[in-house]
């Protein structure tokens, strides 16, 4: 009866059963093999499943990406259904398996990576309650072992559910396993299990030469024998217990005294800042010249510990149980046994110089689902050395008896939970800085190491003066900085707080703000006015457009000091920067005036009181303000020569929440009170400190735009383009523009487009007869023109339409001496002279001649005054000729032609390359009438250059193949002479050896008894001789051994056989064997024969004869 545990089920992405693949070789249907399942004990490591399937079977079409794969674990490995998702497929072919498809899969529970948790904070929850909360809304449900009831708390903020599940096991413990329930047709349940443990301590033993196929020990880390412990940094207080704002150094154990006589584990005198263990010193200490042993120290810290007595207890416990332990993992291949992931096993291999005798957990397991009876490869970790068990148990018993009374009463050590810390209101974050960056804003603050502080919160909003809520939290954690990812040119406002372990929050910090930066360039900065737009006569009608509806319509956006005037008790100044900053300062005199401010100038020559507004239209005023000590900025208004209109700016009556030393963007919408082009803006505020101290503020980036859309700042076209009043005395010095700057005819027709100069720009009778010269009125100005009006002269710039134009020579009208072109008879000719600038100028020309017989193109130089052809191409008589400069030695030529039209000679096509007029390579394709066959010949007799084929050369013939040099040496292939069908003899040389013996170049074929193990030969078999040195152990007996895993010294597809030979002194006292081999290398053992201990410490040279398949 077929085992269902060897089947795998394929379901669609929508989980419809598509087909079943079988792992039984003799069963019908679509077969799969090498179903390798690797599962780690930790959910943080990725489980993988990969299998091969028969690609020639029609049902293999279902093995595609995103489809699901289900298999049932063999009972000895758990018996649960497991589900995976296909993430990659690869097609292949081999002689052994034919066409196949390889599918690589990842665990199906990884779909939880697509589910997102914004903010979940299970507090004081059991594992079942916490896991249910995390999986809420997903297709998975949690199942926790009833024995796991430890309550804990954790925060899951902006993470995927997959990440949250991994974090869950780190906080609440337990062992992870994902399973499904499957009835053979559909999935009825998906489960994330938290088990008390996986596997069991069932005493399974694996021994060398009995159960263990191979074993590797990996040791990392260095054990320490003593620690320098440090705890928390405590808040400093005065004599009354009030916090002074400072913190102590990290607490240490200098003042703690331990005495073994008093029941302590070890002796530790006062003044000693470290704690060590004498037993560890004896085992791991470093020997000194005087015979003493020196501790191996390291730093150890737990900032949650606030007393020296608790600190030394915790440090010593960690020293004994963790810090003094090396990290050891074992990779073991074992014969089939009833062992599962998580089992505690005993491994025995005493043939190592340092015998392996250990007890360890299975932390990773790999087996094949189609042949589980072959056993598994397991990886072991976190072991307990059996030689140390008795000593450690004794030490633990002694320590327990000595400290039983202390530990029964708690000994001053309690479980550290969130509730163990004082519920003290923490101070708000200090030294907060906010830095603008491109598409982000970085915040930093001082980190407070106090043990009772759980972390910090950052609140953010685009609204100034916002009240922080949980929805505004963008960061929560125990760090001293955070980068907030935002868009370009965005303004954000921030407030920060500190939180303790009881969720008690500090007072909020002041509000901070910043605007993310954008990349500035001249187009942004100067409105895309570049040098080519300011060239002579380059200002045309389309550049004097007056349609500024989409831009900043406020004249004065440059914030020039002369563009504004002061109200009473006010003065202003401008700081020149990338964006000018206008400072408005109150001047306090004997009056009680509180209001101060400025307005746009309305007097020539700096008049900016000319902003156009339409009654009823909504506009948006935007600017940035740094308030300094001003808290009321509500005196913002529109100004006309005869009237003032206050803007609704109640939000600016109290701006005390704005940072005093940072710019904050302000956006105000208003409706135009009337239609006029004489508006400007006024900016002002009120002194709210009783006129004790003068107030001031700074503005920049002022703009007014039509509509309600808030846009990035841009300069006003009224300030940077040529419009009425845009150029005034600030830009024009006395007599700076005079007649010398306006040359005759400098304003030509190109600069005066249709209607560009309107009546308003032309005075009465400004154009008179004196300005209309002879022939100044062209055909464009004449509506009709008949032939009788043309009696002589030249016809310029017109179109001639008709059926026939006759003439001996036609030339285009052009005004460039560098260009020549004409049509004459059967000839069309064009020539262009050019000059290349790039270092020394080089004069060149391009010449084209087209006749009825051919086309000639010439590229040449003319630096000497005489044309010198450099490259020439001619197409004539159906042939192509290309050459370099024929005046140069060794010039190059390429000729391509055919003579199919020649009835005398046989048809022939030729491709010829020449150097200096001599044939260097000819490729002929011709018909030979004598043998009656088509032939191709390559002739390179006049060259010593070899032929190079970068990616290979395939030569195929229906008959014989001969490759021969001039002296008769070469290779001759003649299938017709073979005695065995399908074989080809490769001959080397002309006559072979004496007696007519022909040596084969290479021959080799593995028997099926070999290919059934290693796979069939796909390419060539080759032989390699290789040498490797083996250094024998310096200690042991005459049976000592040494092995090496030797990677292949070449790329290979497979290794079929390795023959080792030991040579040199004492080589007759050892023998070499090969224990394993694959395409990745082989393992060789050199063992003593028991006849001599002279092999110890000796280096043996081992030579290998390797039969392999070329990759």
Swiss-Prot record:
One of its GO terms (biological process) is virion attachment to host cell. The keyword GTP-binding does not apply. GO terms for cellular component: virus tail, fiber. Keywords: Host-virus interaction, Viral attachment to host cell, Viral attachment to host entry receptor, Viral genome ejection through host cell envelope, Viral long flexible tail ejection system, Viral penetration into host cytoplasm, Virion, Virus entry into host cell. Pfam families: Prophage_tail. The keyword Cytoplasm does not apply. It is found in: Virion. NCBIfam families: put_anti_recept. Binds to the host entry receptor YueB and triggers viral DNA ejection. Binding to Yueb. This interaction initiates a cascade of conformational changes at the gp21 C-terminus causing disassembly of the tail spike organization and opening of the cap region formed by the N-terminus of gp21. The N-terminus is part of the distal tail cap. The C-terminus is part of the spike structure and is probably involved in host receptor binding. This is Tail spike protein. The gene is 21.
């Amino acid at each position: 009866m077929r085992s269902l545990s060897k089947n795998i089920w394929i379901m669609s992405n929508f989980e419809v059963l598509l087909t079943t693949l079988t792992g039984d070789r003799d069963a019908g249907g679509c077969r799969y093999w090498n179903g390798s399942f690797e599962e780690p004990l930790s959910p943080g490591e990725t489980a993988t499943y990969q299998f091969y399937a028969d690609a020639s079977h029609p049902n293999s079409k279902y093995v595609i990406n995103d489809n699901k794969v289900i298999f049932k674990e063999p009972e000895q490995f758990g018996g649960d259904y497991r589900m995976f998702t296909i993430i990659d497929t690869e097609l292949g072919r081999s002689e052994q398996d034919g066409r196949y498809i390889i599918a690589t899969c990842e665990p199906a529970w990884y779909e939880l990576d697509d589910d997102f948790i914004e903010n979940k904070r299970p507090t004081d929850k059991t594992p079942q309650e916490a896991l249910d909360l995390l999986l809420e809304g997903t297709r998975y449900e949690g199942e926790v072992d009833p024995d796991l009831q430890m309550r804990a708390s954790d925060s899951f903020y902006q993470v995927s559910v997959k990440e949250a599940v991994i974090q869950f096991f780190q906080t609440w413990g337990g062992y992870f396993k994902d399973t499904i329930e499957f009835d053979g047709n559909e999935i009825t349940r998906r489960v994330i299990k938290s088990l008390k443990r996986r596997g069991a301590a069932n005493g399974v033993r694996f021994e060398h030469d009995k159960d263990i196929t191979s074993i590797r020990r990996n040791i990392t880390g260095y054990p320490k024998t003593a620690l320098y412990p440090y705890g928390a940094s405590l808040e400093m207080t005065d004599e009354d217990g009030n916090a002074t704002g400072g913190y102590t150094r990290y607490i240490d154990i200098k003042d703690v005294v331990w005495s073994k006589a008093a029941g302590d584990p070890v002796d530790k005198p006062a003044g000693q800042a470290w704690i060590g263990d004498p037993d560890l010193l004896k085992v791991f200490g470093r020997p000194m010249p005087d015979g003493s042993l020196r501790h191996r120290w390291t730093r150890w810290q737990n900032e949650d510990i606030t007393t020296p007595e608790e600190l030394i207890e915790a440090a010593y416990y960690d020293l004994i149980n963790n810090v003094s332990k090396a990290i050891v993992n074992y990779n073991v291949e074992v014969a089939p046994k009833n062992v599962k992931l998580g089992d505690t096993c005993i491994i025995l291999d005493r043939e190592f110089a340092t015998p392996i005798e250990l007890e360890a957990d299975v932390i990773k397991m790999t087996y094949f689902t189609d042949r589980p009876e072959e056993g598994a490869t397991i990886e072991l970790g976190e072991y307990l050395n059996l030689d140390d068990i008795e000593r450690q148990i004794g030490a633990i018993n002694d320590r327990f008896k000595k400290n039983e009374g202390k530990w029964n009463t708690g000994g001053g050590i309690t479980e550290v939970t969130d509730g163990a810390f004082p519920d003290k209101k923490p101070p708000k974050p200090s030294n907060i800085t906010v830095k603008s960056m491109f598409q982000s804003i970085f915040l930093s603050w001082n980190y407070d190491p106090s043990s009772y502080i759980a972390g910090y919160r950052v609140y953010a909003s685009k609204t100034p003066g916002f009240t922080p809520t949980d929805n505004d939290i963008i960061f929560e954690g125990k760090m001293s900085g955070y980068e907030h990812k935002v868009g370009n040119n965005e303004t954000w406002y921030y407030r920060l707080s500190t939180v303790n372990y009881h969720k008690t929050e500090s007072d909020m910090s002041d509000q901070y703000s910043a605007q993310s930066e954008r990349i500035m360039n001249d187009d942004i900065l100067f409105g895309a006015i570049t040098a080519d737009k300011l060239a002579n006569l380059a200002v045309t009608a389309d550049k004097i457009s007056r349609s500024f509806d989409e831009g900043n319509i406020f004249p004065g956006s440059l914030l020039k000091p002369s563009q504004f005037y002061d109200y009473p008790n006010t003065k202003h100044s401008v700081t020149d920067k990338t964006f000018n900053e206008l400072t408005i300062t109150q001047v306090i005199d004997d009056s009680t005036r509180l209001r101060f401010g400025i307005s746009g100038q309305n007097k020539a020559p700096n008049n900016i009181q000319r902003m156009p507004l339409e009654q009823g239209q909504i506009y948006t005023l935007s600017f940035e303000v740094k308030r300094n000590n001003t808290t009321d900025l509500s005196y913002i208004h529109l100004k006309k020569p005869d009237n003032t209109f206050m803007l609704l700016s109640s939000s600016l009556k109290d701006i005390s929440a704005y940072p005093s030393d940072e710019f904050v963007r302000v956006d105000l919408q208003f409706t135009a009170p009337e239609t006029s082009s004489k508006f400007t803006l006024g900016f002002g505020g009120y002194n709210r400190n009783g006129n004790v101290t003068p107030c001031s503020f700074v503005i920049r980036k002022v703009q007014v735009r039509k509509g309600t859309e808030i846009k990035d700042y841009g300069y006003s076209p009224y300030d940077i383009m040529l419009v009425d009043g845009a150029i005034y005395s600030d830009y024009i010095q006395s007599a700076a523009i005079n007649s010398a700057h306006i040359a005759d005819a400098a304003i030509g027709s190109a600069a005066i487009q249709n209607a560009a100069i309107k009546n308003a720009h032309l005075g009465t009778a400004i154009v008179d007869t004196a300005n209309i010269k002879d022939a100044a009125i062209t055909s464009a100005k004449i509506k009709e023109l008949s032939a009788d009006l043309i009696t002589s002269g030249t016809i310029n710039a017109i179109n001639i339409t008709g059926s026939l134009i006759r003439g001996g020579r036609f030339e285009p009208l052009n005004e460039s001496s560098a260009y020549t072109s004409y049509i004459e008879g059967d000839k069309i000719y064009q020539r262009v002279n050019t000059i290349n600038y790039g270092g020394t100028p080089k004069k060149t020309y391009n010449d084209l001649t087209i006749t009825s017989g051919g086309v000639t193109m010439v590229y040449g130089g003319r630096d000497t005054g005489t044309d010198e052809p450099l490259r020439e191409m001619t197409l004539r008589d159906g042939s192509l000729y290309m050459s370099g400069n024929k005046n140069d030695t060794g010039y190059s030529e390429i000729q391509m032609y055919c003579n199919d039209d020649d009835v005398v000679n046989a048809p022939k096509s030729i491709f010829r390359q020449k150097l200096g007029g001599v044939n260097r390579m000819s490729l002929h394709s011709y018909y030979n009438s004598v043998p009656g066959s088509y032939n191709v010949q390559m002739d390179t007799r006049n060259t010593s250059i070899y032929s190079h084929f970068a990616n290979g050369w395939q030569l195929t013939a229906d008959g014989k193949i001969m490759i021969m040099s001039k002296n008769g040496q070469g290779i001759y292939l003649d299938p017709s002479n073979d005695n065995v069908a399908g074989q080809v003899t490769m001959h080397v040389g002309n006559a072979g050896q004496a007696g007519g013996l022909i040596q084969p170049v290479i021959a080799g074929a593995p028997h099926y008894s070999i290919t059934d193990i290693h796979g069939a030969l796909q390419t060539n078999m080759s032989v390699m001789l290789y040498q490797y040195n083996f250094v024998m152990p310096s200690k042991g007996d005459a049976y000592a051994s040494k092995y090496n895993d030797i990677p292949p010294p070449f790329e290979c597809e497979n290794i079929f056989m390795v023959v080792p030979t030991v040579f040199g002194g004492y080589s007759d006292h050892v023998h070499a064997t090969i224990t394993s081999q694959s395409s990745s290398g082989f393992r060789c053992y050199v063992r003593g024969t028991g006849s001599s201990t002279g092999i110890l410490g000796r280096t043996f040279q081992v030579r290998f004869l390797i039969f392999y398949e070329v990759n």
